[in-house]
Amino acid sequence: MNYPVFKGAGYILVHTPDMIVRNGSTCSIERVTNPDSEFLKEVPNHIRSYEEVVNYLPNQVYIGNKTPDELKAYPMPWYDIKDEQGQRHGKFGQIVPQDEFLALMKICDAFDLVKLSEEFVASVRPKIDENFKELAPLFDKLEGTDINDKEDDFEALVHEGKVVGYVKKAHDVDVNLNAHVIFENLVVKASGVISALELLRSYKINPEDIDYVVECSEEACGDINQRGGGNFAKSIAEVVGLVNATGSDLRGFCAAPTHALISASALVKSGVYKNVLVVAGGASAKLGMNGKDHVKKGLPVLEDVLGGFAVLIGENDGVNPIIRTDLVGKHNVGTGSSPQAVMGALVANPLDKANLKITDVDVFSVEMQNPDITKSAGAGNVPEANYKMIAALAAMRGDIEKKELKSFIEAKGLPGWAPTQGHIPSGVPYVGFLIDDLTKGDKNRAMIVGKGSLFLGRMTNLFDGVSIVIERNNGAVEGEAAGISKDEIRKIIAESMRKISQEMLEE
């Protein structure tokens, strides 16, 4: 069977300190319910600088400057480590400062809804020219204006505590096109655009070779008649210059990225498309989500970055890791919600299809939330909790002995390093490292697991989850082992059919 492969992955973070207070859900709700609270007075004192965010170890892992194994060697909490010197750019992507991101929101705005002051544009324009040369055809959109002439409904754009622009509403009465929604959607679009650019840069991919895009964030764009009509995918493709691509949006809360990887792989495996890009931008609402707990404990607000990623899936090239589309796990409607049932469906079931043991998987990528964030908020170490459940399942199945639980977790698990941006930590942060580990490294098989809490949408209480197995490529490409390609086979078949038809006519 000829399987699709992972061809590359790009990852970005965007430092958005002013958005924490103005646009994060926790601070926004607090302003409405308790406008004079001590938390709102104190939170600005707990926001990190751009340099601190760049130097933060988990962020350096996210963009590929350090590996998960290197992160394991550092004692927690990681936010206390002050002597590390990080870099803006990494192997997989970059950490974007807030001023440049606001300018990119303007560049990604297709309806002239973003207004920036002339002073701000003058200060940021040289940075955009230098750091985002691929967007040069759109640089004319980055122009300043008089921002004092605001309309009634607008979302302020703030940098270093100063209003430098605003987002207009897109319709007088349509609640789905008000300034707040347009702001959130432009945040998703712009961060998705940067993620796609980083993928193209890191792996030197020709944008014209991509023919489909699957966008899998947690926002929705539409109007009063179709709130989630879409389409982020095609809007991102347009800005990035994927001129031969179309696309669509896929949603599934935190499980969406793994759903998207499976869907993209199926599209390539079936031959519908050759190269499919899976992409997602970040969620401004989740900035400072656990800020109250962090501030209460005297910590910095650790949820101070937007996240984004892009993964390219293509036809088997004989080199990159293969995606086993026949070894997929899924949480069915009738599966149940107990930990044993969930892990059985997502981990054991796909392995059973190939008569594999849980120990035959070298590494599991699960919900890779940074435990610095979650432990201080009382939610524990999420990746570790997942690995404990997988280890317990392995022991129940007889794949390991109970005394091996700890060593199993150490050998098969990863430390969490991704921001708590919902879909962002879910399985996909490891794909960049996975490509290296299963080509140049010592690993042969991995599993990506994505899980989601569907009750948040109030349509069902069901849990959700999907998983897929990834393996080292053995170099064999179906149809080419004997020096013959798929296209050549098609030509031979077509010629044979023509000969048969001609002979039948002559008779």
Question: Model-derived features: where do they sit?
Answer:
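Condensing-enzyme catalytic core mediating Claisen C-C bond formation in acyl metabolism
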Residues: 1-186, 293-358, 450, 459-507
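Conserved catalytic cysteine-centered active-site region
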Residues: 162-183, 223-263, 267-274, 320, ...
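Short, well-ordered amphipathic alpha-helical segments that serve as non-catalytic structural scaffolds
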Residues: 188-204, 233, 339-355, 429-437
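Conserved beta-ketoacyl condensing-enzyme motif
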Residues: 189-247, 251-252, 357-388, 393
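Structural signature of cysteine-dependent C-C bond-forming condensing enzymes
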Residues: 202-211, 241-246, 270-277, 353-359, ...
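Acidic, glycine-rich active-site loops and adjacent beta-strand->loop/helix elements
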Residues: 216-221, 252-257, 280-286, 450-455
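Short acidic, glycine/serine/threonine-rich loops at helix termini
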Residues: 224-227, 259-262, 287-293, 324-325, ...
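Flexible, glycine-rich active-site loops centered on histidine and acidic residues
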Residues: 270-305
